[in-house]
Amino acid sequence: DNKELSISNDGRGTRYNAHKPTFGDFSGWPFTDVTSPLNPFSQRDTYLKIAARKPTGTRGSTGLLAPVDMDGKGLWVKAPCYFECRFLAHSAPGTWPAFWVLNQTKNLPGDELDIIEAYGGRGEGNPNDSGYYATAHYWQQKDSEGKEVKAPWKHINMLEIGSKTSWSTTFHTYGLRVGKGSTVYYLDNIEVFRHATNRYSGEQPLFFLVNYAIGGASGWKINLERYDNSSDMYVDFIRVYQGK
């Protein structure tokens, strides 16, 4: 029952945050505002282009978008709800594209659901060029014995599903439905992972983030010199549906 869009069909007039709401950023090349001389955002045909660049003498720049500001004000939806994003990104050592949802604010317990978290490059230290991870994180949550609550995750091998192509070779649509009972992850409308909906995901509102991180908290080394320290991600659309 996902018939009502939570935001406008074309997104015109919508304002976005270029940093991780209520928390610090995590990219080795900093997430950068649209007002910066190193603005990473532009429109190419009908696509949003996120350009990661590191001109000589700079720390570099890249992009993140979220519909919630640093005070937590913005677009939130509650279960049952559905999120999807269609994008293409460059696979190279250090690239770290992701589409994910979050409901944790400040230092309170909450959930992070990574619909796609991909790491570029091949070989040791670059683990999933041909696939990606769908991962839940249950932050600051303890069970009845005081132990950290274990969160489910799965590596998705894209070369065995659907069109059998990687996130770096063609556009794919990555979706997530958070229901009252189950949380389901999709690749091009094909279910690829499912787990029970955690308490915080089922009871508290969520917002999405899309980003093109370069190195940073991932721990993967950056090696983009062969590409003149430049790399791009193209986003076709992001859709958010609020169920009834």
Language model features with spans:
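GH16 jelly-roll
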Residues: 1-244
